[in-house]
Amino acid sequence: QGYQAGTDSFSDNESAKYAVNLLSDLGTKGYFEPGFASVDFTSACNLFFGGSGAIFYTGSGQISLAEEMYDNGELGFFPVPDTEGMDNMSTNVPVHAGFAEGFNKATYDDTMQEFFDYMCENFTDACYNQAQVFSPFNEELPEGLPQLYYDTQPMFEDAETAWTSWDDKLDSDVMTKIVDEQQKLAQGITTPDEFIKTCDSFVEK
């Protein structure tokens, strides 16, 4: 929000500069797969769960793919690591809450209330038994799920701090430009200093 408002910048934010340099190192020192800039999510899943990738950022929607490998001790999970010398927070796992629902007060009638009640009462069951993802509701996990659900849930229960992703803070034009610059940074086309200068120019102070 500070960046979008022009009150903060990459050049003035130590955490942002650290992240820029980290992305540059990961991209230019061989940590990403060849041709990573053109890889879609399905291809990335196949690479990781096929045993060729080492680290993959994903959500509970892929637990069904990870279940057998996790049970066999072939993969594990870890939260966002702390950074030495930085102001770290105790909440170290991103929790994505899905989509918001909006209702029109003028047309909200008994039928809509019945639907809303039904949705809330059955949403958790649909998450685990149909969509196979974590439910956003703070309810007990049902029995019979893959072990990975039970082992990762404590990280969410202990989360104390919430934050908003860049996708929601920035307008679409600025977000698109930053993503384009990230691609160039990770491929070594631009330097960290060039990235910082360019991205700071996207927002008027």
Predicted segments with their positions:
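Short, hydrophobic alpha-helical packing/hinge segments within bilobed ligand-binding/sensory domains
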Residues: 44-48, 65, 112
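Glycine-centered hinge/linker elements that transmit conformational signals in sensory
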Residues: 6-37
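Beta->alpha turn/N-cap motifs
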Residues: 41, 58-63
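Extracytoplasmic/periplasmic substrate-recognition and gating elements
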Residues: 29, 68-133
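Periplasmic solute-binding protein
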Residues: 1-5, 20, 88-104, 153, ...
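Alpha-to-beta junction loops
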Residues: 50-59, 73
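C-terminal capping/gating helix-and-loop segments adjacent to ligand/active sites or protein-protein/ligand interfaces
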Residues: 129-136, 140, 150-204
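Short helix-initiation/N-cap motifs at beta->coil->alpha
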Residues: 35-49
